[in-house]
C-alpha cells in the first residue's frame, strides 16, 4: 500500500477511485431509505429535489471539493430531518452517488472527515 503525503492528497480527484464497492453498496441501501423519495430511485431528481446524476449535477459541483458536497449533504439532508445521519452514513451515500455517476471505484472507503474530503477535487472530464 502506498501512503500519500499531504501534498499528494491535494491532487486527488473523484476520478482517482476514492470510494470502495462495499461502501457504495451500503450507500445504495441508505439512499433507498433516506433519499429516493425526493431524489428518485434512479437519482434523477423530483419536484423539489435536484438530480444527483448527469451533466447538470456534474457541472453544478465541478471545481468544488468532495468536502463541499459532503458538508451540504451532512447539514441539509434528509430534508425532513437535516443532520440525522451519521458522518459514516453520509459518506456511504456519497460513495453511492459517485458510483451512479460512473466515477471509478477504489480499494478503500471514502473518508468521513470533511478536512480529508476537502483534499479531493470534484471535477468533470
Q: Where are the model-predicted features located?
A:
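The canonical Cys-X-X-Cys-His
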Residues: 27, 31-42, 93, 97
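Bacterial N-terminal signal peptides
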Residues: 1-5
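Electrostatic cytochrome c docking/interface patches
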Residues: 9-30
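Flexible coil segments in periplasmic/lumen-exposed cytochrome c-class electron-transfer proteins
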Residues: 12, 80-125
